[in-house]
């Protein structure tokens, strides 16, 4: 009986040691970035905090929708004939020698305005069930080669190879480490919520985000048998969400709001996560789409981090200008100047 406490203590020590040994390290990060992230996590661990990440070009390399569209189009799964009539917004640019692709059509919608093509490239996958789309997403993620596509440069048809998403190993490490330390991880994507959930919440891709924590462009889902309509967002808010039971539902082209791009990302944090508690980390890669949540959400008073994936020199230049402008605006209004503080900036190759 006298040995029992000693044995219990020894077992406890072994258990703690094994937990420490199993703790995730940020091995696929530059050392200065890893140290900054480790310090932020240590300061905010197990206090009910949360982090928010963009997905395309932030959590994985390249873009899910922009590669899934030509992949499914090349397989004959998405065509002009299957496209919902509401998505035929302008005439196709056909010639005697060339029939314009839907991928090219998407590019031309972006030339009109991002506010046109951002929703369109989520809506274009309507008409399929989530189960069907999950199969195509998994096929896309397994590709080891780019997808051929065409687009217009003026009136000239150009060829393009579109890369499928490539998981950032560094980000899967960071997601895991945050969760290990009691910091909830949310995804805030300008892409289709249902499509991104198929990657972010599937354990085989390494992110392990709770399905309900994936927030994106939400489209009404339809039960083909009953005609009933719903969305994951509506179900989650009502406390009646089961991701698996939704897989037989059909994606429709009808948008739910808030729309999760530009200021809508910040609005979605307030709507779906917390109206007052700010995240201790926000990660992004696009100044216009991620800028609002990066500059307005991070709780710098807690040592919170602005995480930037520096994939384009012109975006970095734009972001530096935004830091300066926003810091000056904060100072002018007598607010704490946080816009130019606590930035962790890495290049895609450094976290691949």
Locate predicted features.
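C-terminal cap/substrate-recognition subdomain and adjoining C-terminal extension
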Residues: 23-32, 36, 41-43, 48-50, ...
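A metal-dependent, Asp-based hydrolase signature
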Residues: 65-67, 72, 78-162
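Bacterial N-terminal signal peptides
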Residues: 9-17
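Non-catalytic pre-domain segments flanking phosphatase-related domains
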Residues: 3, 7, 21-55, 63, ...
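Charged/polar interaction segments and conserved charged motifs
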Residues: 13, 83-102, 333-334, 341-352
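A generic alpha-helix surface/boundary motif
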Residues: 63, 115-116, 194, 263
């Amino acid at each position: 009986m006298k040995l029992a406490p000693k044995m219990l203590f020894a077992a406890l020590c072994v258990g703690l040691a094994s937990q420490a040994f199993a703790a995730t390290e940020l091995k696929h990060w530059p050392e200065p970035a890893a140290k900054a992230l480790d310090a932020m996590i240590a300061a905010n661990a197990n206090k009910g905090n949360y982090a928010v990440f963009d997905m395309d070009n932030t959590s994985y390399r390249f873009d899910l929708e922009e590669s899934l569209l030509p992949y499914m189009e090349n397989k004959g799964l998405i065509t002009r004939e299957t496209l919902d009539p509401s998505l035929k917004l302008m005439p196709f640019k056909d010639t005697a020698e060339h029939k314009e692709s839907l991928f090219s059509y998407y590019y031309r919608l972006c030339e009109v305005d991002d506010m046109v093509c951002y929703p369109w490239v989520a809506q274009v996958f309507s008409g399929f069930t989530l189960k069907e789309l999950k199969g195509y997403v998994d096929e896309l993620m397994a590709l080891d080669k780019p997808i051929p596509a065409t687009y217009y440069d003026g009136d000239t048809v150009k060829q393009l190879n579109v890369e499928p998403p490539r998981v950032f190993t560094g980000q899967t490490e960071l997601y895991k480490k945050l969760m290990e330390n009691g910091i909830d991880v949310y995804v805030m994507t300008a892409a289709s919520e249902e499509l991104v959930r198929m990657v972010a919440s599937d354990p085989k891709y390494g992110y392990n985000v709770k399905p309900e924590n994936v927030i994106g462009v939400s489209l009404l889902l339809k039960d083909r048998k009953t005609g009933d309509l719903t969305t994951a967002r509506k179900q989650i808010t009502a406390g009646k969400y089961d991701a698996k039971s939704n897989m037989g539902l059909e994606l429709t082209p009808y948008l739910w709001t808030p729309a999760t791009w530009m200021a809508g990302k910040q609005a979605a944090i307030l709507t779906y996560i917390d109206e007052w508690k700010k995240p201790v980390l926000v990660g992004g890669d696009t100044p216009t789409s991620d800028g609002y949540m990066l500059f307005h959400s991070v709780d710098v008073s807690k040592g919170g981090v602005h995480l930037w994936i520096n994939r384009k020199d012109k975006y970095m230049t734009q972001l530096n200008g935004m830091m300066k402008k926003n810091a000056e605006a904060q100072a002018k209004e007598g607010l704490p100047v946080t816009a130019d503080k606590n930035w962790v900036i890495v290049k895609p190759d450094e976290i691949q």
